[in-house]
């Protein structure tokens, strides 16, 4: 057993890559620890900086999970964002699903905004709230 808990807990708080992808989709990318103060870590994911708490003693490079629906996509440059290019765009019922090329590899993003549609080849900026970045133990 990789992890026990309710489906909601497994989805929102995966402990490793297997669990992160077992229930739903997750973007698993590497993050570099650039600073540590007590149990507060500063992580760098491509051009984006994230502050996250962890009671674990983390190595210099960690894997993190970014859920597709937690990633915000925007045409306007954000101060703290990942630069990306739309690779595919698909309308799926009540949302758009995008696959993007970025400095951390391919990222999968789901947007509920069906009015502001991004086109293949378009340059965009991705951001995520610090609390939505989940450190994985592998």
Model-derived features with residue positions:
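Non-catalytic connector elements of ABC transporters
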Residues: 26-28, 36-138
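Internal alpha/beta loop-helix hairpins
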Residues: 1-48
